[in-house]
Structures are given as C-alpha cells and as structure tokens.
Amino acid sequence: MKQSIASRLKTLEPRIFEFQDDSHLHVGHAGNRGGGHYSILVVSTLFRDTPRLERQRTVKGLLQDLFSDGLIHALSIKA
C-alpha cells in the first residue's frame, strides 16, 4: 500500500513522505469492511502558503480511487 500511495503522490514532488500502517489497531472494529487504516506525512514545496484543509483535500483527491475500491478505510493526513 505504501508504494501505491507514494506513486499517486508523485505529482506533489514530496520532499518528505512517511507512511504508517495502523490497521492492526482497528481489527474487529465496527464498520471496518477490510480496508486499511493508515497515517501519512507529506511535505512538499508545492504546499507553501496553502491552507491545511486544502492540502489534505489535495492529498485525499489523489488517493480517491483507493478509497472507492475499499483499499483504504481510514487515512490520517499531515501535509
């Protein structure tokens, strides 16, 4: 999953990309239909002077297919 996410974020030219799989913390939780729980950190000069919410929306937009396909259930984004 890390590579799938990283490849979709290449257009942001990230200087820093960190990925953490938190799925093991959510095993058996109600509403979890099998998609993973992840945390990511993305630092890019393209985000300079961009509000936090807009940065997060940009990142989520690039990963939308992974959400739609059920591969990501929850994602914590720091950008």
What are these regions (language model features)?
Residues 1-79:
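N-terminal, polar/charged subdomain of small-to-medium soluble alpha/beta proteins
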